[in-house]
Amino acid sequence: MSELEPAAQRADDAAEMAALAETHCLSSRGAHATKPPFSYLHAFFRAMQEPYEPGTREDGYVVLAVAQNFLTVDTVQRRLALAMRSAQPETTAGYDNMRGSDRLRRALAAHMKRVLAPNHADGAIDPDRLCVSAGAGAVIDNLFMTITSPGDGVLIPAPYYPAFDNDLRVRNGVRAIPVAGADAESLPTGPALDRAVEEAAARLTGVRALLLTNPSNPLGVVYAKRSMLCAARWALREGMHVVVDEVYASSEYYDVGPFVSALEWTPEDVLGENPADAADVDADAGGGSSWTLEDARRAMATRLHVVYGLSKDFCASGYRVGVLSTRNEQIVRAMDNVAYFCCVPGPMQFAVAEVLEDEGWVDAFLEENSANLRDAHAALTAILAEGNVPVVPSSAGMFVWVDLSAHMKAPTWEEEKRLWTACFEDEKTRLLMTPGRDCRHNKPGCFRMCFAAVKREALEVAARRLVDLLKRYE
């Protein structure tokens, strides 16, 4: 799964969509929108009808396939409810700037500068360069509408967030191109990215962007600044946009390696003037070595974009608040238009701004949330370790990436599906995980376990069920 779908599969999909469009009076775009965003959606809905409940439904399903954080949600809800009480109808009931009220963008700019990027290259984040939408997904949808055209491709280091394929394709007609690194924990380097572009050339109109996520979903690792810059430098020198998704930036629970936001990158970083980067520039330069500091500055001003949101770090996936930071004035102008279709409701903007302005509360909450994430991660991985289940060491986000390939008869996607089905269908297991194939991993047998959306007892039950199944799986 490290390349685009085979031609035969694409032809079958096209025929199916054409038939669906004709039968149900849909456009081809509407027909494609009827496809589920990932393969396990049916299982999710089924599991939610019979969830595990201690004492009342002990044989219920445990869902560890959704990247949500409910561990500290009560703290957030209490503070937001307090903020909502002071919202004034005359300031929140009418139209406002569709890409975010002035107050919300100022609050977000201050928060992002203080928490995500204290060493921001410009000294401050300009609120006028922030574009707020109803969640990071809407931000990405709008952004790629402005920087790509139907038939274009976007490079994404794999494994990656399983909904990216749908997020790029369903409205904008853009294809995700998975690119594997040297191992599951590494970002691809210049040669691997070059090969991915060459392989996609015959199928796509062009490759327009590189989409990075740091910290990683599904791995839960924090990529080093140097690794991120290697990939970004290559793309910027090739004339591509670089989009950095940082929605897990404040969800670190182990201080393994410091998270460095792309908001802190400088033109010198992108150019590679630091002597420590010299080897990386030689190996991954892309576009030749004739770049100047002014070229790097211009590339950052027009083609480097950072996505952030409150869904993950603030246990607020239902509140739908995401933000784009870009220096490209024309993208901001386009967002003024398209943000109308997905703007955040006025009362929510008011409440979120008030909460973010309460810096003492924010700091205490983030500390509490990190502790809760750390405890949940430790509880899950301790049981997996007892069962000799290999995992990628993670330090951020809400995921554990497990490798169950040793329990498969063969290293095939069919065997991965059989193991995934056993986890879900076995009456003693009834566990829903994200299959690695949906994350476009290149090795069958790996799964994502999301540990922050269920209570501790359910999490531990799920881990023990998995270990028990693996002992008897054939």
Where are these regions (language model features)?
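Short Gly/Ser/Thr- and Asp/Glu-enriched loop/turn motifs at secondary-structure junctions
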Residues: 125-127, 393-399, 442-444
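Helix C-cap/helix->beta junction micro-motif
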Residues: 237-238, 387
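N-terminal small-domain helix-loop-helix segment of the aminotransferase-like
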Residues: 8-135, 192, 356-359, 472-474
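PLP-dependent enzyme catalytic core of the Aspartate aminotransferase-like
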Residues: 2, 110, 124, 299-300, ...
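Hydrophobic residues in well-ordered beta-strands that form the structural core
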Residues: 156, 178, 244, 352, ...
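PLP-dependent aminotransferase class I/II
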Residues: 275-280, 284, 289, 293, ...
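Conserved core of the PLP fold type I
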Residues: 90-237, 249-277, 289-294, 305, ...
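Conserved PLP-binding catalytic core of the aspartate aminotransferase-like
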Residues: 373-374, 387-427
